[in-house]
């Protein structure tokens, strides 16, 4: 099987592909693996539905002095790739509709991110919101343009939807906060 077929049909491969894009993006922002970010690091959270602790493996943990940030990179590409390659307009609309349903299921479905309780991880001062990474800017913008309520519903559920550019901008802000904090500490010494 070639890589394109895997990318368009195999959800596990898609997840690894998305995660690789995310890791490359973080590295390009001068973050260092296993110091500034930690891929697939097992954490413990509280499962309110089962009333017990459970282990989870977030795609990425970004570590900054004041806060840590959880990033999910598992947006499905199956229907998206069909959508961008389809010539027939009627079929193209259906693939986009299927893609939107897939994104919503990933966020809000019975086994979706909303059930993972990433914002309740033990021992990690993480933001209440989870950053949901879309690995391509056009994937992000077309998804939000086609589903006008997705962004609002995501924010209500403590998800920050992010394109690669958005994530780089957030990292820049986090880095500036870290730098300013260091300057203040140096001045007060």
Predicted regions and their residues:
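Amphipathic, heptad-repeat alpha-helical coiled-coil/stalk segments that mediate oligomerization
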Residues: 2-189
